Amino acid sequence: MVNDMIETIEYFAQAQPDFPVYDCLGERRSYGQLKEDSDSIAALIESLKLGEKSPVLVFGAQSYDMLASFVALTKTGHAYIPVDVHSAPERVLSIIEIAQPSLIIAIEELPVSIDAIRVVSLAEIEAAKAAKAAFTMTSPVKGDDNYYIIFTSGTTGQPKGVQISHANLLSFTNWMIEDAEFAIPERPQMLAQPPYSFDLSVMYWAPTLALGGTLFALPKEMVSDFKRLFSTIAELPIGIWTSTPSFADMAMLNDDFCQEKMPRLTHFYFDGEELTVSTARKLFERFPDARIINAYGPTEATVALSAISITKDMIETYTRLPIGYPKPDSPTYIIDEAGNALEPGQQGEIIVTGPAVSKGYLNNPEKTAEAFFTFNGMPAYHTGDLGSFTEDNVLLYGGRLDFQIKYAGYRIELEDVSQQLNQSPLVESAVAVPRYNKEHKVQNLLAYVVLKDGVREQFARDLDITKAIKASVKDHMMAYMMPSKFIYREKLPLTPNGKIDIKFLINEVNHQ
């Protein structure tokens, strides 16, 4: 059992100083180096006299210096806000505006100009490591202090910063390293694929650091080169794979992604989106002896609230795979619209309670009050997901209650996509609509668009209009949010209340 994340990392720095904590294509860093480097960076941070417990934004990819900076910030009592190098400039600015960080550590060059906040460059981080300054922890992150803050998308187009405390993190980490479903080995050798800005990353780094294992990362240049990416992954000595199911689907396009070629790979941990029967079946065909874990949970409940080991019998029995047994310390309920707990077999909203529930959204009391509450005397969160329990206390997923979806592993709010499209000077009104496949998984995003007067006459083809709209919004819209197909209409259907009838459009798209 882990009682303190930093003390555990420090323990391994003493017990196994030469054991690799990080490996990027053979470029290794040991636990001893992580302690030395994080101490040096912590000394630099402490010298800046930042506000007590103020959050710090860290911008970069899957590099070792990101990890060392996170550990350093925890040692100095600051929560870190991981922002991925592939983030759109407008999103970076929005996060900075909302979070008001006291410092920005730019492991990669920032895509925006910042004057009002001190920015520490990679060169300064390298200089700090070279100086090998001593550091003594006096006020590290503890208890209810924020450990990290991860930004998700918001319904108004504004991202929301989910505050995860040290206590939240320990609740998740101890469940994962002790639970029989995960069956995680000592010194796990984990693939570090999801970006640190995606809370699925916590599923690989937290148990790995808690058990003295190794993180296998890939350089940022490889992320967009899928052929090279997956051929490289097939050569890594990883034992545990953590990703969205969609990423595994892409990996299976490579014939070398199989048990024969990757005999060390024995565990698959999935979260972030629904694991379909077809993906699980294909994976068992490639890795017949593998342990496949289907986990479920929102960022607001610290990564996951339930998990289950998928069996071959389940694949033949269920049309939609179960999402697991709830964490023992996190009572999970199904409630009706009046807030009453329902019996097994009855479908309603999934709510989670207990020590893994976040304190809320950073600097956003209104959204916090909407989603977080108290249930049976415990902190609770409305997931917005439909679900039910079996008689054996297994949680079943029934889809989204609202128009928030999971697509390509990312949680996307359709209103967010629509709001971004409506910023185009070519668009009068637009609405994003998901198309589902037969396994209830979002297959792609479509956009229904009404053009501004005179726009259509400027283009020869609809394809050219689509290219122009995409070009006009690309600087403030994440690539994964961009619809793959645009449908042009003279007007959009309305509800009796005068709102765009999104349900009608969803039904139209999925029954063509």
UniProtKB/Swiss-Prot annotation:
Lineage top rank: taxon? Bacteria
Write the record's keywords in alphabetical order, separated by commas: ATP-binding, Cytoplasm, Ligase, Nucleotide-binding
Q: In which pathway does it act?
A: Cell wall biogenesis; lipoteichoic acid biosynthesis
EC number(s) reported in the record = 6.2.1.54
Q: What is the annotated localization of this protein?
A: Cytoplasm
Which residues are listed for ATP binding in this entry? Answer: T152, S153, N294, A295, Y296, G297, P298, T299, D385, Y397, G398, G399, R400, K499
Gene Ontology biological process terms in this record: lipoteichoic acid biosynthetic process
What's the catalysed reaction?
holo-[D-alanyl-carrier protein] + D-alanine + ATP = D-alanyl-[D-alanyl-carrier protein] + AMP + diphosphate
Task: Say yes or no: keyword Ligase present.
Answer: yes
Chief localization = cytoplasm
- Its Gene Ontology molecular function terms? ATP binding; D-alanine [D-alanyl carrier protein] ligase activity
Signal peptide start-end: none
Q: Which Pfam families match?
A: AMP-binding, AMP-binding_C
GO cellular component terms, A-Z: cytoplasm
Keyword rRNA-binding annotated: no
Residues annotated as binding D-alanine: D199, V303, K499
Q: Which HAMAP family match?
A: DltA
Biological role stated in the UniProt entry: Catalyzes the first step in the D-alanylation of lipoteichoic acid (LTA), the activation of D-alanine and its transfer onto the D-alanyl carrier protein (Dcp) DltC. In an ATP-dependent two-step reaction, forms a high energy D-alanyl-AMP intermediate, followed by transfer of the D-alanyl residue as a thiol ester to the phosphopantheinyl prosthetic group of the Dcp. D-alanylation of LTA plays an important role in modulating the properties of the cell wall in Gram-positive bacteria, influencing the net charge of the cell wall.
Similarity section: Belongs to the ATP-dependent AMP-binding enzyme family. DltA subfamily.
**What name does the UniProt record give this protein?**
D-alanine--D-alanyl carrier protein ligase
What gene makes this protein? dltA
